Amino acid sequence: MNLILLGAPGAGKGTQAELLVHKLSIPAISTGNMLREAIANGTELGRKAKEYMDAGNLVPDELILGIVADRVAQPDCQGGFILDGVPRTLAQAEALEAAGVKIDHVVSIEVDDREIEGRMTGRRVCGKCGASFHITANPPKIDGICDSCGGELIIRKDDAPETVRNRLAVYHATTEVLKDFYGKLGRLVEVNGSQSIEKANEDILAAIGAKV
């Protein structure tokens, strides 16, 4: 089964991907990992991508999608795969179809923006050991102090309120077009990501007709 996972930052997409990898025994493939592997393996597409990256430029769609097509043709993807980070645009989605990369289901994990803001802006990370906390879901015993090492808890730049709102705006601007595209193809399923991790995962498996 070939899947694409969509979800705003903080929606729990990474957690659901990990569960699906375990339950369906298929790999999750991220754009970043694919690029790193192609470059490390010295493939022709990898070498071309490295030239763009070394020059500080974005890797063109045709190279990204060529690397995707190569990766999903590998033996470990014969039983299916989960794509993460691609497609990001309508042009990439259309090119993926044109390249013959078969997608069975596109799962969109839906969480209200206000809830996502609460999830992300409430996160705290220890500046010393990297331990993670949340001011409501997983608070430290002493406010602002790491339980593990006593280090100071900080707010990452990515979790600052204005940054979170900007990231959500960008996500919606690009993803609504993708949802419309795959919805017209009859492949889009939407799952409530505000419920428990376990219930959301059950709903995903039911929506895609997976037997586990």
Residue locations for each model-derived region?
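Glycine-rich phosphate-binding loop of ATP-dependent small-molecule kinases
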Residues: 1-212
